[in-house]
Amino acid sequence: VDDRHVVTKAAYNTPVTFCEIFPPDNFPLYFYREPSAPDLELTWEDLPLDAIRDASIFWISVTGLSKEPSRSAHHAALGTRDRRRFTIADLDYRPMFWKDKETAHREVSKILPKVTVAIGNREECEVAVGERDPERAADALLEAGVELAIVKQGLEGTLAKTRTERVEMPVTSVTTKNGLGAGDAFGGAICHGLLSGWSLEKTIFAASTAGAIVSSRLECSTAMPTEPELLELMRARRDEVAPGLTDL
C-alpha cells in the first residue's frame, strides 16, 4: 500500500467503530465520528488529481457524498477522472451518515453518470435509483449511465448486467462466523477481476467466493483471501455454482 497521498486533519479525531457479532446474520456497527470525521473534511485541494486521473481503477463510496466539503471533493475527483475505464461507485448506504433517504438519493443520482461501474445491495440500489427489484435496479443503473451494474442479493446471490451481458451468480455456501468485511472482499475481488481481464462470470464468481471466505472467518482485514486460495475454492465449488465456467 502506497501511503504518499494520505493527508491528516489535525482538528478531528480518528474515527472509531465497534462491531458486535451475532452469527449468522446480525453484525451491528457503532460509529464514533463526531463532530465530524477526517474523511468527510477532505477538500479538492487535498486530492492528488493527476494520480486519480491516471489510476488503473478508481473506487469511491457514496458515504463521501453525505457532507461537505467531502461531497465537492468527490465531484472534483470524478470530474478529473472523466469516466475513465473502471471508475467505480460503491453504493454503500449507511443511514446514520445522511439527513434522510431523499438527500442520499439526490446526491447519489448526480454521480451515476460520472462512473462506469456501480455496486450495491437491494436497499442501496433503491436509494440510488428508486428500484429494489434486482433486474429493474440493474437496468435503472445502466440507464443512469453506468456500464456495469452489480446488485448484491445476500443469500440469493449476485446479479451483474452490462448492456450486452447478464450474469446471475448463486452464493458460494459457507458457515458464517462474521459477515463484517465480506463486502470489502467482494469489492476487492471485483477490482482484481476487472484489472486481470477476467470474464464477467469469473469476476462475479470470484467476488462472491471472496465474500464467502471472509464471512466464514472471525476476522475482517486479516481474513482476506489470496488469489491462489480464492481460485482453489472456486474450482472446488464450480460444479455447483458456475458449471459453465471454463477459465479456472
What kind of region is each of these model predictions?
Residues 1-62, 231-248:
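Conserved N-terminal subdomain of the carbohydrate kinase-like
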Residues 57-140, 156-158:
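Conserved beta-alpha-beta core of the PfkB/ribokinase-like small-molecule kinase fold
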Residues 9-10, 94-95, 155, 229:
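Conserved beta-strand edge residues that scaffold enzyme active sites
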Residues 3, 85-87, 149, 166:
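Hydrophobic anchor at the start of a short beta-strand
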Residues 79, 130-248:
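Conserved phosphate-binding/catalytic region of the ribokinase-like
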Residues 18-22, 104, 165:
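Short low-complexity, flexible loop/linker segments enriched in glycine and/or proline
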Residues 50-53, 113, 144:
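Structured loop/turn residues at beta-strand edges in well-structured enzyme cores
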